[in-house]
Amino acid sequence: MNCLNEINSEGFVVIEDVFSGEEIKKIILEIEKITSSEVENSTFRKSEDLFAIRQFHKEVPESLKFIFNSNLLKIIKSIKGEGSFITKSIYFDKPEKSNWFVSYHQDLTISVNKKIESENFKNWTVKQNQYSVQPPVSILDSAFTVRIHLDKTTKENGALKVLNGTHKNGVIRVENIDSKNEVETICEVGEGGV
């Protein structure tokens, strides 16, 4: 499975059926085990419009054996080879009737376990006891995001919108994004796709 050409050209790729229905059920079950208690957790965010878990891989570690199945491992290897590791993981559950909109943006930060002032690492923040920082462009260029779909995502219920090829333009300030002159793709993905 080699999706590198499409990623290099467009900046993204949609791959269906990475996870079976049974694997999705197991991932959801692990999430439900953790979230069913009423215990407050600083990495959980819950409102009418959103439920989120920051540091997902630390909060729901039992899910990792289902997430890193042979299909996903092949995809990761085809993109980056050996040695990839998690720098950030967030779980979002957006209720069907919520009107939650995410504007165009670039993921510019990575999570780190402590703050060490270093050249070209900037815009430090702390969210739910987790440090985040914008690393140098060379590190950003070597990172990639995997968005795992636990249910079908369409343009009506929150599919990711991307501007094709803009990853080649480096870091772009939000006010400089000219979406009218870019090709937009709405990434509709079925349950179990990435």
Residue ranges and their predicted role:
Residues 2-10, 19-191:
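Non-heme Fe(II) oxygenase catalytic core, chiefly the N-lobe of the double-stranded beta-helix
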